[in-house]
Structures are given as C-alpha cells and as structure tokens.
C-alpha cells in the first residue's frame, strides 16, 4: 500500500512537471515567432447599433427623428447621419416615409418616397459562407421614387448565396426637395463610410466595400467613383465620428445608368485610384442610357483605370418601357423574357470573382493589387512614359481603400 501511494505521488509530481514545462514551451515559442501585439487603431466613438426589427412602423409625425422600418425581415436599419447633422433638413426629419406596397406579393415594399432621414439597411451573411464583401444597392426611380423592391430587396438572397453582404441604401429624392447631384451623392458616400466604420461589427472586410446603382441610382454610384476625396475633405470635422474613414468604394456597379459625370463629353478629374467598375445596359433599345454607360466606360478606359468592364446587350429595353406585346420591361434580377440581358447579374459575379472579391475576408484582392501596380506607374504628362490618360489625377487617399482607418473584420 505504501509503495502504491508513493508511486501515485510520483506520477502526480511528474504530470505537474510536464504541464508546467509545456506551458513554458508554448510561451517561449509564441514570444519567438510573433511580434508584440499591435494596439487596435483608435477611432471616434460610434453610436450603438439597433437590434434587427426593433424599429417603429411607419406612422404619423413623431416627436423624435423618424426611423424607417426594414424592407426585409432581419435587416438592421442605421440612419446615415447623427441627429442634428447640418446635412439634414431638421424641419422635416420627423416625417414618416411613405411605402408603396406590391399588388402581387402581400407585405412587400415596392418603392419608397418622402425620405428625410436617409439610412442603410444591412443584411449580413452568416458563418463560413461570408466573404466579407459588401455591396451597397442604390435603387432607381427617376429621383421621384426609390424602387427598393426589384432593385434592392430581390438582391439580398441572390448575393447571400455567393457570400456577399447586402446593404440597401435609402437616399433622399428630388421629388422631396433634394438635389440628386449633392444630397443623394452625399448619402451614397456617407453610406460607404458608415459601412466601413462598422466593418468589424458586421464582419465585413473594409477593403471589399462597393456600391451598385440602377438607372437613377447609377447617378450615385458613378460619381462616388471620383468624388470620394472631395467628400472626405469636406466632412473631416473632429466631432464627426466618421472623420478619417474613407468613402472610397472598392468597386462600383453601373447598371442601365442615368447620366454619369462624363455626360456629353464632360471631363472632371479622375483619381488615379478610381475603383474598378462593372457597367451593363441594353443597346439600341435603351440607346440614351447605353450612350451614358459608354461615356463612363470611355473616360475610364482613356484614363487607364484597371478592371473596368462593360456589357451592352443587343436585345433589351429600359425597365418600365412598353414592349411589343403590351407588357413592360422588368428590372433588377428578372430574366426579361429569357433574353441575354436577363443574365447580366451572372456576368457581374464572373467579374467580381475574377477580381478576388469572393475570397475569404482579409485576403488582398486582385483588384487591390492591380490598382497598386497602376499607381506605381508614371502619371500622364510626367515625361517618364505613360500617356493618353486624360483626366487621371493623383489622389491623396489610401490607394485601395481605408483599411488602416477602419477596424479589421472579425473572422466569420
């Protein structure tokens, strides 16, 4: 018995010694292999995020700023601007949005008007499917309404299947007294900053955030590709919680667009770090919009901006146009009576995958690498090669986004 007790005590001492030695080994290995942990970047405080669906329903004027309801269940709605922002019309901030409901699908919101507290509605991808990419959707509607059904809500499940997070933008409209070129474009750029600021919370890669606009919504996504520096300089007050967060989109989608900044030969400066663009439109059947699409493409091509791709389809019309059988051309994801124009979204996915946006979060994209390589080349007019890059200008922003100024995404 005494021998057994002695053996047991010796075994316990041996196990304790082994555990202690292993702990020392792990600590020593970690100290040798890694650098001391780097402190997380400090940013101004952001307001807490609301819970999904914990929002008031549309109703009469309130005694507080109106907050819109989600278009789809589970969406997190976040106002773009803090209360009291000088960019808001405070005398109208309490007015409720007006939702036009679908006649075919009960409970579906087809379009929205009376937007005075612009917002984003965030739909994230769960688990290992999440690529960290995020697409902000700017619906069309001629600046008189916001067609969030076909040109926003329908894309949430589509992009989810590819691991892409979807953000629905509710921007201010001309019919409600706002300027599309100023207020609506500001809303788009502010949305990019807001998503980038909350990248960690939403498990979004801050280097994979872009905007896709449809028709009038493309009048937001196309200028966002060249005006981000100006917006960031204008909105850099120390009291702004988003000050220092870049509004540069990492990519833009320009879908059957309205007039772009290059309409009728206009030549505004193009930053040399302008983002990649995917452009699509019907051709002769939507001639004016196709010309606007081509003007953007030609300007970026002449400036030498990498990875600008355009698809013009021979058969098709603009959404809402009357067809020969009396029906109307549909928008968004619909197959458009099975014509090739009805599959443009798969060409976008091909382009998106090729540029590396469907990789896991934290991996540098091909798009980012090629922009960096482009920036290393001599700018036009430097006398060191290059040339033909009309309008391309040096940009003071980070070459490929604002990762150093935003939180690193958490692992999904």
Features from the language model and the residues they span:
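Short beta-strand element of the alpha/beta-hydrolase
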Residues: 131-140
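N-terminal cap/lid segment of alpha/beta-hydrolase-fold proteins
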Residues: 44, 50-130
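C-terminal catalytic histidine-bearing segment of alpha/beta-hydrolase fold enzymes
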Residues: 301-412
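Short amphipathic alpha-helix adjacent to the substrate-entry channel of hydrolases
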Residues: 124, 148-167, 297-298
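Catalytic nucleophile-loop/oxyanion-hole region of alpha/beta-hydrolase
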Residues: 147-148, 154-155, 169-203, 337-340
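Short beta-strand/loop motif that positions the catalytic acidic residue
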Residues: 279-281
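Primarily recognizes the serine-hydrolase "nucleophile elbow" in alpha/beta-hydrolase
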Residues: 186-273, 370-371
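Conserved alpha/beta-hydrolase "acid-adjacent" motif
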Residues: 286-295
